[in-house]
């Protein structure tokens, strides 16, 4: 009998913890970009032009010696990806950039990044993606490459620059649920597209 009396209380506590976690997640997603940590490499996860532009600027400033842009479409070129970047894409800079075309999900980003890090002897990595995506990206990359030291570099997404609305709330809630799922090891789908 006491057990059944405790159930509503436990549900209330779990709901409170869940809501507090979501509130923290929202604040964290909107956190301003901090000064970047110098690393061996930089990885930018596709999904927004601002992520690629930020990663190219970081590479140009010498924050990392190599850059992986993970999740690039099969026909996209480096020139197309960098056309709006506020830097000059010199041949020397271009030679330090790898376009990863096999990842089709965040899990795939992790696998693709791990392979690239091993091939290029990367021991520390700056992860560039949207603020709402950074925590899940860090989980998946760490799972795939636990030996690499990761540092987050969240970029403010255009979707979060506007006044909060239903779409913003839905985006953050969806990402929060997926972040929890990634911690629990759920939704472990196909990592990479098949190699040709």
Where are these regions (language model features)?
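A transmembrane-helix-recognition feature enriched in membrane-embedded lipid enzymes
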Residues: 163-194
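N-terminal type II signal-anchor transmembrane helix
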Residues: 2-33
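Generic signature of intrinsically disordered, low-complexity segments enriched in small/polar residues
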Residues: 15, 21, 135, 179-185
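Proteins with a high burden of low-complexity, intrinsically disordered sequence enriched in S/T/G/P/A and R
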Residues: 20, 26-36, 40, 178, ...
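A structural signal for short, hydrophobic/glycine-enriched beta-strand patches
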Residues: 27-166, 172
